[in-house]
Regions:
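S-adenosylmethionine
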Residues: 1-250
Length: 250
């Protein structure tokens, strides 16, 4: 109960993370969620360079710090509204956590590849993959609902990626036309979101233990369909934004 009370998390959740990571690590995890977090962004390399973007943002009064792992990632602060920043309106950067960027960075994406993003909204990984294609190849970006595909389309228009096609599609439904055709499959699947509680504090109150099991089952169902799209020698990158090992390693 100490961890639950100290870090303001439901008791079932504190027990789960302690069981999976140990008490000391669990406390560090929950403490990190209480810290203020600057926005993390990814440079749109098809429009600018990291150096040019950093300079432009600083001239606009934005505080810019380099990311921890990737040369085109930055954290930004000292701003009120993204829409006021010309570089954002012009599609020179996207808001995207560096962990999300790493999921695409580790993929061996080459010019001319066919990339499929199966649960894509709002499109962060889709556009990162498109950037890495350098104008060649194609990214097929799919999600379940019209609302989600519209989000992807909005970001596509702002970022000006011409090698991205957006489709509304249920990932549980097999698409025979894609069997063994994809060079890189991005599968950032529906999850509990327990890894982003620092940004979305309400997650810990909305999620239940029962839902964790349901989400893990859904992930398995989706993976049982989409892995068939990967061509021999291709790659599937599976990722989530949760800490729950039941939705990841297990």
């Amino acid at each position: 109960k100490y961890v639950s009370i100290t870090y303001s998390v439901p008791e079932w959740l504190s027990k789960l993370i302690i069981e999976q990571y140990g008490k000391e690590s669990a406390e560090k995890i929950f403490a990190s969620f209480l810290e203020a977090r600057p926005l993390t962004i990814r440079t749109n390399l098809s429009k600018t360079t990291p150096e040019e973007l950093e300079k432009e943002l600083e001239e606009a009064g934005v505080k810019v710090e380099k990311g921890n792992y990737l040369p085109y990632a930055f954290t930004i602060s000292n701003l009120n509204y993204l829409g006021k920043i010309a570089a954002f309106r012009q599609g020179k950067f996207a808001v995207q956590d560096e962990s999300s960027q790493l999921a695409v960075a580790i993929a061996d994406i080459n010019e001319g590849d066919f990339v499929l993003d199966v649960c894509a909204a709002p499109g962060g990984k889709t556009f990162h993959a498109a950037d890495r294609l350098k104008g060649a190849g194609k990214v097929l970006s799919r999600d379940l609902t019209e609302y989600k595909t519209e989000l992807i389309e909005e970001n596509k228009d702002r970022m000006h990626y011409e090698n991205v096609e957006v489709q509304q599609w249920d990932a549980l439904e097999e698409d025979e036309s894609l069997l063994e055709s994809v060079d890189v499959l991005l599968a950032d699947l529906p999850c509990s979101g327990l890894g982003i509680m620092g940004r979305k504090n309400d997650i810990k109150y909305q999620m239940t233990e029962e839902q964790l099991g349901e989400l893990a089952a859904l992930q398995r169902q989706i993976l049982s369909v989409v892995w068939k799209y990967v061509k021999p020698g291709g790659q599937m990158i599976f990722s989530t934004c949760t800490l729950n090992k039941g939705e990841n390693a297990e």
